[in-house]
Amino acid sequence: MATDADMAIFGEAAPYLRKSEKERIEAQNKPFDAKSSVFVVHAKESYVKSTIQSKESGKVTVKTEGGETLTVKEDQIFSMNPPKYDKIEDMAMMTHLHEPAVLYNLKERYAAWMIYTYSGLFCVTVNPYKWLPVYNPEVVLAYRGKKRQEAPPHIFSISDNAYQFMLTDRENQSILITGESGAGKTVNTKRVIQYFATIAASGDKKKEEQPAGKMQGTLEDQIISANPLLEAFGNAKTVRNDNSSRFGKFIRIHFGATGKLASADIETYLLEKSRVTFQLKAERSYHIFYQIMSNKKPELIEMLLITTNPYDYQYVSQGEITVPSINDQEELMATDSAIDILGFTPDEKTAIYKLTGAVMHYGNLKFKQKQREEQAEPGGTEVADKAAYLMGLNSADLLKALCYPRVKVGNEYVTKGQTVQQVYNSVGALAKSVFEKMFLWMVVRINQQLDTKQPRQYFIGVLDIAGFEIFDFNSLEQLCINFTNEKLQQFFNHHMFVLEQEEYKKEGIEWEFIDFGMDLAACIELIEKPMGIFSILEEECMFPKATDTSFKNKLYDQHLGKSNNFQKPKPGKGKAEAHFSLVHYAGTVDYNITGWLEKNKDPLNETVVGLYQKSSLKTLALLFASVGGAEAESGAGGKKGGKKKGSSFQTVSALFRENLNKLMSNLRSTHPHFVRCLIPNETKTPGAMEHELVLHQLRCNGVLEGIRICRKGFPIRILYADFKQRYKVLNASAIPEGQFIDSKKASEKLLGSIDVDHTQYKFGHTKVFFKAGLLGLLEEMRDEKLAQLITRTQARCRGFLMRVEFKKMMERRESIFCIQYNVRAFMNVKHWPWMKLFFKIKPLLKSAESEKEMANMKEEFEKTKEELAKSEAKRKELEEKMVSLLQEKNDLQLQVQAEADGLADAEERCDQLIKTKIQLEAKIKELTERAEDEEEMNAELTAKKRKLEDECSELKKDIDDLELTLAKVEKEKHATENKVKNLTEEMAALDETIAKLTKEKKALQEAHQQTLDDLQAEEDKVNTLTKAKTKLEQQVDDLEGSLEQEKKLRMDLERAKRKLEGDLKMTQESTMDLENDKQQLDEKLKKKDFEISQIQSKIEDEQALGMQLQKKIKELQARIEELEEEIEAERTSRAKAEKHRADLSRELEEISERLEEAGGATAAQIDMNKKREAEFQKMRRDLEEATLQHEATAAALRKKHADSTADVGEQIDNLQRVKQKLEKEKSELKMEIDDLASNMESVSKAKANLEKMCRSLEDQLSEIKTKEEEQQRTINDISAQKARLQTESGEYSRQVEEKDALISQLSRGKQAFTQQIEELKRHLEEEIKAKKCPAHALQSARHDCDLLREQYEEEQEAKGELQRALSKANSEVAQWRTKYETDAIQRTEELEEAKKKLAQRLQDAEEHVEAVNSKCASLEKTKQRLQNEVEDLMIDVERSNAACAALDKKQKNFDKILSEWKQKYEETQAELEASQKESRSLSTELFKMKNAYEESLDHLETLKRENKNLQQEISDLTEQIAEGGKAIHELEKVKKQIEQEKSELQTALEEAEASLEHEEGKILRVQLELNQVKSDIDRKIAEKDEEIDQLKRNHLRVVDSMQSTLDAEIRSRNEALRLKKKMEGDLNEIEIQLSHANRQAAEAQKNLRNTQGVLKDTQIHLDDALRSQEDLKEQVAMVERRANLLQAEIEELRAALEQTERSRKVAEQELLDASERVQLLHTQNTSLINTKKKLESDISQIQSEMEDTIQEARNAEEKAKKAITDAAMMAEELKKEQDTSAHLERMKKNLDQTVKDLQHRLDEAEQLALKGGKKQIQKLEARVRELEGEVDAEQKRSAEAVKGVRKYERRVKELTYQSEEDRKNVLRLQDLVDKLQMKVKSYKRQAEEAEELSNVNLSKFRKIQHELEEAEERADIAESQVNKLRAKSREIGKKAESEE
């Protein structure tokens, strides 16, 4: 650990990088209890520091730092590390490795602003959200050359380590920077680039001058300036980050051999182009749009025809438009200057701005809908004119292309109409594409500019890419990012543990290698392997009718339940809908696949793309040059056009995978360094850290994954000496004292003597390795031991100190005793006189001497003091001199050492240079000698060639003369001269072939074509020979005529002959000389040709291997196509079988319905039914037999498939062997290339070292210059030869590189094909049942092909032999010619006979050649014909396989849909029955409640009437009293009293009325409460409706929800019954009325029973219908089995059809018949498709019927719920009415009591005051009694009448209600019966149609079978004839060979 002095070089950054010494000491001395200090899981804070209070029964009670007491499980506590590990720089060194330890270490370091921390291989950085002085220039210099452990954690340390590793290990490096948006990835990437630009540029201070006009700024400036430009076009504001990079980038910085910066390049990934057209509210688009509109450069506003207000442009104003932390004006100037520095031309710069402005204008394009049409039309042309002007287009063409694009249909283009939405979508896609392509083009241009063409040796790559993303809504972009991180994490796991395990291996630890990279293999394979997610996505993109649902279904079929990493998402409230889940290493992510197909295809308007390609803006045309537009494709021709078309449909996922694979291959070739960036909080607050957020990122970016892997190994390792020194205290006796012992053995003995798990540690060569956690245990044991030792030591120290103190006390005691004794003695003699005298005299004796001594001592003291001062001054001077001398000495030593090192290096370099120079001189001499030899040979050859040509021309002239003379003599002589002329032509042809060979040396790729040309030349020679033959025949005829003339001239010629003899001798001698010269030249040429042939043989071998591989690839491609066509054919056959099955199912259903209709009618019908059943049983047996046969054939097919797979495996093995051979040759060539490169490199290094030596050592330079001047002449002489040789070696190396590229391309193709083969194997296993006949056909075709190949090879051999015979004949002709020339005059007669023989043999040979050629041509034709037949057969096989696959797929889908609908139907039936039962029970309860309610209303009305009568009586009585008062004047007082009482009664009545009003208010309040309760119930009902709808979508919870609703309804019914009982208890007084109601209820119950009986009958009918439906299902299953049987028959038919097609190819007449049959089958197929459509319509009809039933069930449920609410309301109202009636009853009683009291008072008053008026009173009383009687009688009568009326009304209502219910039930049943009858009729009709179709198919089958048998017979006859012909041809060939 560095001291504070060492940290001083970091300047003001030191406190932000490492703790001070004081803090470290304080941390180590902090009190700490290892057993009680723990981290605890917390709900809010994730983990908190706590102290253990107690433990009991698996529970632990802890107290947190905040004072909170918690009780947790034991697995929820984590041990805390000792204080010395606080703020540790490398978290991998911690004793306890777990999540809370990592979290709190990061938190504490972040709180101290130490933002960089190591975690094993990782460097973790936390965003500080403020500026820290840790990137200053002095920090860069401080980190330079420091090892990782020597300096604090920092991004500069990672960068410098990568740089140093690159220089020392000679290996490429990479730095992987990942993290979420806003974590600081881009900033750290900038710092890395800044660091490299600083340290690599500082190594070479003298900058090289760049050519004028090429670039502005140095390479360092350009690398740094690339960032502002990429950020302007690729960065944007997001919610988390104001400057978020919306793309990933991999920056490669290249360095030379000396570490100097050489060049750079950038690769980008996953640009978020959707941001161009859409942004969220809190975000904004890319910075460049807002920079342009900042008006910092007004000329841009004018040029782009835009305004400065972003809200004028829809694409860039959907979110925010300004960012507080970014100054758009300054950024614009930075972007503009970056464009200039990076060397963009002014035109390119203008084009960038114009295209950016055009994208903004695109967002403002308006379109509208035409009247009465869906077609879109432009809403104006102003914006389009601006956009078209900026893009160099015609606005009218642009609008036309957008509204009416051209689409390719077949081979023609048609114009397609677009809706408004489609046009807007197209415009958005084009805008995104333009921006994306412009961004990628800028990256390419930047790379071109950063490529300085300087020599570069190594590179350091910096990867800045988004981290793992888990959002609420995850789409395709998240899958790509997460897949990238999955691959990077796998790469990290593999790399990390490879390093770990290399350490174990180096230390000699026994360890079984574990590749932790394979932990993530399952998820990676699920995504990228064949039939993975990307594969299925790309496959779906190829199908035009594919949808998101079909994509989801394929994913589920392929992976759900088969792969643990693929799961079905769990629905959560508030979350976005998800379609599937993937288990990544960072967690489970739910993905939504909406729109993935469109995103992946990324379609563009091809017509507009065609306009872009023709744009006058060159940059735009360049951007879309490689995209195949509508016009471009139609106009493209040749191979190039086809290639573009093929590559135009490249999906986004395929491109992404290609880039990712390239990135991973780059990373695997480097040594990686990992940096993980973290966001501390969401609010961008400096210093604050959110625990859950940081933990989530640690999981996502693999830090915790790295800890997991680290824990599986031995993460903690300590040197033996350190371990012995620190832990010796644990058992000191284990290490013997007094003798030497090795630290390793001491550590082994020490650990062996301690009670720990011995499997938790291992001993290496130099270190002891511990598992995680064991060191913490050792630390605890050490602390305990130290505590024991310290307590013992303290005890001994205290005892020793006390003993010392006691000894001192004893000594003090003795001295005190002595002093006391002396004092006592002195006190005794003090007063003695002699003692007094002694005291006076003693001091006087030595006083004078002492004064002298004191004076002398003072003088000496002063002298010594002065001397001491002088000596101190001298000493200081000497010390200063010594320090300065030491410093000078050290400096001089350093200089001497440096000069010595430099001298040693220089000497070594000089020696190396001399050696290399000698080697080079030797090589140059060899090369010059070889070159001179070759030049001399060439010169001699050319001279001799010219000589030969001249002599040949002279000879030709002489021969022509001779021929003219000999033509007159004899015809044979003339023929031989013609042949001589032909031979001379052949010599010229041979010269031409030599010239061709020299050309082939320059262009080796044309070798194959040259061989073809030679072949053609041979054929031409044969043709010329045939022509010569015809000419000779004509000449023979002519010469026979002139024979007589020749005889006459013979005598003349004899004389001429003697004369010419001398000339001939001379010519013969000259020709002999020429031939000798020619032989010498030929030998030299052969030597030269031998060297050329060696090179050519190598190249030809490589070409042959390449051709073989290409053939294999073609064969594999053909095989793939065959298999795909087989799958397609299988699918079609399956579709046909499916249609047959559907037809037969309808037939069976009709039959079953007929049987049911006719069931039980008559005995005859019963017999018919029995017969039908017997037939059915027979058919079932036949079906079972057919299935057995089918299984047998399937087994045979499996066996054949296994054989075919074995053949394919052998082919693959052969290909692998070829590949290994090629790779071996490739490695040899690479080694040669490496040797050449190393030689060139050593030369360049030597040159550079020489230049340096020349600058540093001038003396040596003068001597070397003299030597160089002497050698310069020789170098100048050989420089031209060297340049020529270098060009030749460059050509050879280029050819080798091309071959390497070809080999790598072939190997990639091979890998792709092996993957395709694996996919096809899986397809083959599924589609194996339909391969019997195609496999036979394929085998027979292969057999024929092999036979033909053998014949062809035999014919080729025969042809070669004929050619050899021909050449032999030619050579013999040449020999005869020479003999003729030498002995022509002497032996003319012998020459003539020989010439005749030669002519005859030549003629025979020519005839034989013609015969062989004709035979070859015929064999070639038969081979071509058979190849065509094989190709046709393969196409048919592929079709059948494809049809089978399609059928199988449709079968599965149909079965799945059928089972789902069956399940839904059963569930709805159950729900319907339950709802019907509930509705019946509720309707009965409703009837009861209604009756009770009406009775209570009647009772209330009677009470009201009685109340009114009583009030009337009271008023009558008061009137009578008033009349009595008027009649009797004496009783005025009584009257007053009565009036007073009357007023009191009125007040009482008013009070009663007030109480009545109060009660009415109560009633109103109760009604209001009732309404509120009703609304609550309605709300609850609505909520339950929503729940029911949701639960119906999820079928698993339907039963529970129905049960809950049932329970609720039972509770409400119980509540109603309870209310009813209470009501009956309250209404005991009106039992008479209740009896009437009971009787009516009994009658209603009777009616209810009747209706229930009717409902039971209907239920029975319904059950019968269900049973019949189940019977129909069984019959459908039977029909399916019959369909399978028919499918097997169809397969047999297909086999027969294919057999007939083979025979058709033998006999062309049969071909026509078979094609007619195919047409017939096609018509059948179309009819079956129509039946399939009918079936689909029937299914849709059934679905609609099921939906109706579901709707009825829902209506029934709603009615039931309404009935419940009505019943509850009625019960409440009934209760209220009962309360009011009881209250009125009480009021009535009170009023009766008051009337009685009044009556009593009135009697008393009359007795007191009216003694005389008794008679009148009695009369009045009698009158009153009569009136009362009449009133009572009238009341009784009216009450009875009212009761009767009410009774009859209730009865009428009940009857009407019952009749309405009956009528509804009858109608419902009638509808059900009608529907069932309709179904029965449709099933009958379908069965009849199926029966007819089956009959037709059977007749066709019989007919085709008959024709098949005939065709097979004809095929056998034809095959036997072919075999005979082959045998004949072989016999003829053998005869010809024997004759020769």
Curated annotation (Swiss-Prot):
Coiled-coil ranges (or none): 844-1940
Its annotated compartments are: Cytoplasm, Myofibril
User: Where's it mainly located?
Assistant: cytoplasm
CC annotations in GO:
cytoplasm; myofibril; myosin filament; myosin II complex
> What's an example of a GO molecular-function annotation for this chain?
ATP binding
Q: Which residues form the Myosin motor domain?
A: 86-783
Q: Which family does it belong to?
A: Belongs to the TRAFAC class myosin-kinesin ATPase superfamily. Myosin family.
Tell me the protein's name. Myosin-1B
Organism per entry: Gallus gallus (Chicken)
User: Region Actin-binding: what ranges?
Assistant: 660-682, 762-776
Gene that produces this protein: MYH1B
Q: Where is the IQ domain?
A: 786-815
Please note every region of biased composition (Basic and acidic residues): 1928-1940
A single Pfam family it belongs to is Myosin_tail_1
Listed PROSITE patterns = IQ, MYOSIN_MOTOR, SH3_LIKE
Known role: Muscle contraction.
The residues that the entry says bind ATP are G179, E180, S181, G182, A183, G184, K185, T186
Task: Report the record's Gene Ontology biological process terms.
Answer: muscle contraction
Q: Sites of the modification N6,N6,N6-trimethyllysine? A: K130
Q: Assembly state and interactors?
A: Muscle myosin is a hexameric protein that consists of 2 heavy chain subunits (MHC), 2 alkali light chain subunits (MLC) and 2 regulatory light chain subunits (MLC-2).
Q: Keywords in UniProt for this one? A: Actin-binding, ATP-binding, Calmodulin-binding, Coiled coil, Cytoplasm, Methylation, Motor protein, Muscle protein, Myosin, Nucleotide-binding, Thick filament
Annotated Myosin N-terminal SH3-like domain ranges read 33-82
Its domain description in UniProt is: The rodlike tail sequence is highly repetitive, showing cycles of a 28-residue repeat pattern composed of 4 heptapeptides, characteristic for alpha-helical coiled coils.
Q: Which Gene3D superfamilies match?
A: 1.10.10.820, 1.20.5.340, 1.20.5.370, 1.20.5.4820, 1.20.58.530, 6.10.250.2420, Kinesin motor domain, Myosin S1 fragment, N-terminal
Region Disordered, annotated ranges: 1912-1940
